[in-house]
């Protein structure tokens, strides 16, 4: 019988004195109750996703809320049948969201407690999606968008979040005078990014309050106008959002059939994220190219204990071969 697990997604921008010391204390408590997950703590706040059974997660929420700095912290809760994490990490970072402004010769970082976009609830955000005069901008990484996104949302031509400010500046003339609404997984990235857009001179900037995770749970909108699944940074990889008319938009890297199963290329020097069915992962030894499939450090081969002969037979079946220098 599977175990009933709760996954908690949360963040809060709040000044934390001695944040490094608090991170150590936080980790100690989490381990003492058997919680698992990943938490970032910085001078500017806290951002985390954790999982555990009902009793464990309730103890954690009560403990966090007992600190006056986090008394109103909003936990978004998913019910699952298995743990979303295998270990517990609490790390101190300079920022809970790194927008990369100072790294890329932009102005100083944004404080969302001082400057941020207008909060939109799920109903208001759905109305924005249907408004032809509103620009909807996805602020996540490209591989997150490719698994699922809001219908009609712009996919910036970027690899990761830190490249977004430059992309916006390069394309400013396309939507500077329009209403712009942004969204991300749980809201933490949009708090900072929408504030940056306001500072850049955009006159009408909104953000989906609570992120995609909240939109999918809203009893009125029920995730409608979301296509695909939502990428999450834990062992689940993806979660459903649209409970009205769900669709699969991502396609298997190898044969183009509908697929929402993300894997990393088995070549550790490539590590490209691709969609692949279990059948195709086996067939192509999880390699995204002939070079990766035949790489001497192919992780699929190592994980599954394939002999050199077995490996060669897999590749021969798809018209490829192992180079002579690959060891047994």
Curated annotation (Swiss-Prot):
GO molecular function ontology, one term from the record: oxidoreductase activity, acting on paired donors, with incorporation or reduction of molecular oxygen
UniProt keyword annotation of tRNA processing present: yes
Alphabetical list of Pfam families matching this protein: Rhodanese, Rhodanese_C, UPF0176_N
InterPro entries tied to this protein: Rhodanese-like_dom, Rhodanese-like_dom_sf, Rhodanese_C, TrhO, TRHO_N
Record-annotated disulphide pairs: none
Enzyme class: oxidoreductase
EC number(s) stated in the UniProt entry for this protein: 1.14.-.-
Transcription regulation keyword on record: no
Active site: 184 (cysteine persulfide intermediate)
GO-annotated biological processes: tRNA modification
Ranges where the Rhodanese domain occurs: 130-224
Family: Belongs to the TrhO family.
General function of this protein: Catalyzes oxygen-dependent 5-hydroxyuridine (ho5U) modification at position 34 in tRNAs.
UniProt protein name: tRNA uridine(34) hydroxylase
Lineage summary: Bacteria, Bacillati, Bacillota, Bacilli, Lactobacillales
């Amino acid at each position: 019988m599977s175990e009933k697990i709760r996954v908690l997604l949360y963040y809060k921008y709040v000044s934390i004195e001695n944040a490094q010391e608090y991170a150590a204390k936080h980790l100690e408590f989490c381990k003492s109750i058997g919680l698992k997950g990943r938490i970032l703590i910085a001078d500017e706040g806290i951002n985390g996703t954790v999982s555990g059974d009902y009793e464990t997660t309730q103890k954690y929420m009560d403990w966090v809320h007992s600190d006056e700095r986090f008394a109103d912290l909003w936990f978004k809760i998913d019910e699952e049948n298995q743990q979303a994490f295998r270990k517990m990490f609490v790390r101190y970072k300079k920022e809970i969201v790194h927008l990369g402004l100072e790294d890329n010769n932009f102005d100083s970082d944004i404080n969302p407690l001082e400057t941020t976009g207008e909060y939109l609830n799920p109903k208001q955000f759905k109305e924005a999606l249907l408004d032809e005069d509103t620009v909807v901008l996805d602020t996540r990484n490209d591989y997150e968008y490719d698994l699922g996104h809001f219908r009609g949302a712009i996919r910036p031509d970027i690899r990761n979040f830190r490249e977004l400010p430059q992309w916006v500046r390069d394309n400013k003339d396309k939507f500077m005078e329009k209403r712009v609404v942004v969204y991300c997984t749980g809201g933490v990235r949009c708090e900072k990014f929408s504030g940056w857009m306001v500072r850049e001179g955009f006159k009408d900037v909104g953000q989906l309050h609570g992120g995609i995770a909240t939109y999918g749970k809203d009893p009125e909108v029920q995730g409608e106008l979301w296509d695909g699944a939502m990428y999450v940074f834990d062992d689940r990889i993806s979660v459903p959002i649209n409970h009205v008319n769900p669709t699969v938009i991502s396609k298997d890297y190898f044969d183009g059939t509908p697929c929402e199963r993300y894997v990393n290329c088995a070549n550790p020097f490539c590590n490209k994220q691709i969609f692949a069915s279990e059948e195709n992962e086996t067939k192509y030894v999880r390699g995204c190219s002939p070079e990766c499939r035949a790489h001497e450090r192919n992780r699929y081969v190592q994980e599954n204990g394939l002999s050199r002969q077995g490996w060669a037979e897999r590749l021969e079946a798809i018209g490829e071969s192992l180079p002579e220098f690959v060891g047994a």
